[in-house]
Amino acid sequence: VWTLTLDTATPYLALGLFRGEEGVGRVVRVERRHEEALFPLLDDLLAEVGARKEEIGALVLGEGPGSYTGLRIALAAGLGVALAQGARVYGVNSLLAACWPYLEESGPPLTPLFTARNRLYYGATYTRQGGRPLELLPPGKLRAEELPPTGLLLDPPPDPRALYELLPFAREGVEPLYL
Protein backbone atom coordinates (compact mmCIF):
# COMPACT_ATOMS: atom_id res chain seq x y z
CA VAL A 1 0.00 0.00 0.00
CA TRP A 2 1.35 3.40 -1.03
CA THR A 3 0.87 6.77 0.64
CA LEU A 4 0.32 9.75 -1.64
CA THR A 5 1.51 13.12 -0.33
CA LEU A 6 0.26 16.35 -1.89
CA ASP A 7 0.60 20.07 -1.16
CA THR A 8 -0.47 22.94 -3.41
CA ALA A 9 -0.62 25.79 -0.85
CA THR A 10 2.34 27.66 -2.38
CA PRO A 11 3.61 28.33 -5.91
CA TYR A 12 5.09 24.82 -5.71
CA LEU A 13 3.43 21.50 -6.40
CA ALA A 14 4.77 18.99 -3.86
CA LEU A 15 3.80 15.42 -4.71
CA GLY A 16 5.15 12.09 -3.50
CA LEU A 17 4.49 8.36 -3.26
CA PHE A 18 5.95 6.47 -0.32
CA ARG A 19 5.84 2.99 1.18
CA GLY A 20 8.11 2.28 4.11
CA GLU A 21 11.60 3.47 3.21
CA GLU A 22 10.99 3.47 -0.53
CA GLY A 23 9.36 6.20 -2.51
CA VAL A 24 9.79 9.26 -4.66
CA GLY A 25 8.83 12.88 -4.30
CA ARG A 26 8.89 15.86 -6.62
CA VAL A 27 8.65 19.57 -6.01
CA VAL A 28 7.92 21.66 -9.10
CA ARG A 29 7.41 25.40 -9.21
CA VAL A 30 4.16 25.76 -11.15
CA GLU A 31 2.96 29.18 -9.92
CA ARG A 32 -0.81 28.97 -10.52
CA ARG A 33 -0.90 25.87 -12.73
CA HIS A 34 -1.17 23.19 -10.06
CA GLU A 35 -4.25 21.61 -11.62
CA GLU A 36 -2.49 21.24 -15.00
CA ALA A 37 0.62 19.61 -13.56
CA LEU A 38 -0.80 17.44 -10.77
CA PHE A 39 -2.20 14.36 -12.51
CA PRO A 40 0.51 14.05 -15.21
CA LEU A 41 3.13 14.21 -12.42
CA LEU A 42 1.19 11.62 -10.39
CA ASP A 43 1.16 9.31 -13.42
CA ASP A 44 4.95 9.78 -13.76
CA LEU A 45 5.53 8.94 -10.09
CA LEU A 46 3.30 5.87 -10.26
CA ALA A 47 5.25 4.64 -13.30
CA GLU A 48 8.57 5.35 -11.58
CA VAL A 49 7.73 3.18 -8.55
CA GLY A 50 5.80 0.60 -10.58
CA ALA A 51 2.50 1.18 -8.78
CA ARG A 52 -1.12 1.68 -9.80
CA LYS A 53 -3.60 4.21 -8.41
CA GLU A 54 -5.51 1.30 -6.87
CA GLU A 55 -2.54 0.70 -4.57
CA ILE A 56 -2.86 4.12 -2.88
CA GLY A 57 -4.15 3.41 0.62
CA ALA A 58 -3.56 6.75 2.34
CA LEU A 59 -3.13 10.39 1.45
CA VAL A 60 -1.38 13.12 3.42
CA LEU A 61 -2.51 16.55 2.27
CA GLY A 62 -0.98 19.92 3.08
CA GLU A 63 -3.62 22.00 4.85
CA GLY A 64 -2.02 25.40 4.35
CA PRO A 65 -1.92 28.21 5.08
CA GLY A 66 -1.47 29.49 1.59
CA SER A 67 -3.29 30.33 -1.58
CA TYR A 68 -7.04 29.83 -1.22
CA THR A 69 -7.31 28.33 -4.71
CA GLY A 70 -4.15 26.29 -4.20
CA LEU A 71 -5.52 24.75 -1.01
CA ARG A 72 -8.75 23.83 -2.74
CA ILE A 73 -6.88 22.10 -5.58
CA ALA A 74 -5.03 19.75 -3.22
CA LEU A 75 -8.14 19.08 -1.17
CA ALA A 76 -10.40 18.43 -4.15
CA ALA A 77 -7.87 16.27 -5.99
CA GLY A 78 -6.80 14.42 -2.86
CA LEU A 79 -10.32 13.76 -1.64
CA GLY A 80 -11.30 12.61 -5.15
CA VAL A 81 -8.43 10.11 -5.24
CA ALA A 82 -9.26 8.97 -1.69
CA LEU A 83 -12.92 8.45 -2.55
CA ALA A 84 -12.09 6.53 -5.72
CA GLN A 85 -9.53 4.31 -3.98
CA GLY A 86 -11.18 3.98 -0.57
CA ALA A 87 -8.06 5.54 0.97
CA ARG A 88 -7.72 7.29 4.32
CA VAL A 89 -6.94 11.01 4.36
CA TYR A 90 -4.71 12.90 6.80
CA GLY A 91 -3.83 16.57 7.08
CA VAL A 92 -0.51 18.24 7.92
CA ASN A 93 0.26 21.93 8.24
CA SER A 94 2.13 23.10 5.12
CA LEU A 95 4.48 25.35 7.11
CA LEU A 96 5.55 22.38 9.25
CA ALA A 97 6.06 20.23 6.14
CA ALA A 98 8.27 22.97 4.66
CA CYS A 99 10.61 23.23 7.65
CA TRP A 100 10.59 19.61 8.94
CA PRO A 101 13.68 18.55 6.91
CA TYR A 102 15.67 21.39 8.49
CA LEU A 103 14.61 20.92 12.12
CA GLU A 104 17.32 19.24 14.16
CA GLU A 105 16.57 17.33 17.35
CA SER A 106 16.68 19.86 20.21
CA GLY A 107 18.07 22.38 17.71
CA PRO A 108 17.11 26.01 17.35
CA PRO A 109 13.55 26.86 16.39
CA LEU A 110 12.73 27.63 12.76
CA THR A 111 10.08 29.93 11.35
CA PRO A 112 9.01 29.04 7.81
CA LEU A 113 7.31 31.92 6.00
CA PHE A 114 5.09 31.85 2.94
CA THR A 115 4.60 35.19 1.22
CA ALA A 116 1.00 36.33 1.56
CA ARG A 117 -0.70 39.42 0.16
CA ASN A 118 -0.37 43.01 1.33
CA ARG A 119 3.24 42.64 2.50
CA LEU A 120 2.29 39.96 5.00
CA TYR A 121 3.63 36.47 5.61
CA TYR A 122 2.03 33.24 6.74
CA GLY A 123 4.33 31.92 9.44
CA ALA A 124 4.71 29.67 12.45
CA THR A 125 7.63 28.63 14.64
CA TYR A 126 8.60 25.02 15.28
CA THR A 127 11.26 22.94 16.94
CA ARG A 128 11.82 19.17 17.21
CA GLN A 129 11.95 17.39 20.56
CA GLY A 130 11.85 13.67 21.13
CA GLY A 131 11.45 13.15 17.39
CA ARG A 132 8.17 15.09 17.45
CA PRO A 133 7.31 18.53 16.08
CA LEU A 134 6.69 21.16 18.73
CA GLU A 135 4.78 24.30 17.74
CA LEU A 136 6.12 27.39 19.53
CA LEU A 137 4.15 30.00 17.57
CA PRO A 138 0.89 28.92 15.93
CA PRO A 139 0.31 29.65 12.25
CA GLY A 140 -0.80 33.18 11.55
CA LYS A 141 -0.34 36.25 9.38
CA LEU A 142 2.74 38.26 10.30
CA ARG A 143 4.08 41.67 9.34
CA ALA A 144 7.81 42.03 8.66
CA GLU A 145 8.37 43.83 11.96
CA GLU A 146 6.80 40.89 13.84
CA LEU A 147 9.24 38.30 12.48
CA PRO A 148 11.79 36.71 14.82
CA PRO A 149 15.38 37.86 14.25
CA THR A 150 16.77 34.40 13.40
CA GLY A 151 15.72 31.01 12.07
CA LEU A 152 13.68 32.30 9.13
CA LEU A 153 13.00 30.21 6.03
CA LEU A 154 11.47 32.40 3.31
CA ASP A 155 9.10 30.62 0.91
CA PRO A 156 10.44 27.09 1.30
CA PRO A 157 8.39 24.56 -0.66
CA PRO A 158 6.54 21.93 1.37
CA ASP A 159 8.51 18.68 1.24
CA PRO A 160 6.73 15.53 -0.04
CA ARG A 161 8.79 13.18 2.14
CA ALA A 162 8.24 15.42 5.18
CA LEU A 163 4.48 15.09 4.69
CA TYR A 164 4.98 11.31 4.81
CA GLU A 165 7.31 11.46 7.82
CA LEU A 166 4.78 13.63 9.68
CA LEU A 167 1.99 11.07 9.17
CA PRO A 168 2.35 9.69 12.74
CA PHE A 169 1.56 13.18 14.06
CA ALA A 170 -1.17 13.98 11.54
CA ARG A 171 -4.84 14.13 12.29
CA GLU A 172 -7.18 11.92 10.30
CA GLY A 173 -9.30 14.04 8.02
CA VAL A 174 -8.30 17.35 6.56
CA GLU A 175 -9.21 20.89 7.49
CA PRO A 176 -7.79 23.73 5.38
CA LEU A 177 -6.13 26.56 7.27
CA TYR A 178 -7.45 29.75 5.72
CA LEU A 179 -5.85 32.81 7.31
Where are these regions (language model features)?
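A short glycine/serine-rich beta->alpha loop
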Residues: G25-V30, E63-S67
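DPxDG-like acidic metal-binding loop motif
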Residues: G57-V89, S94
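Phosphate/pyrophosphate-binding loops at sites that engage ATP/ADP/AMP, CoA/4′-phosphopantetheine
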Residues: L42-A58
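Oxyanion-binding and handling regions
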Residues: V1-E22, R29-E36, P40, A51, ...
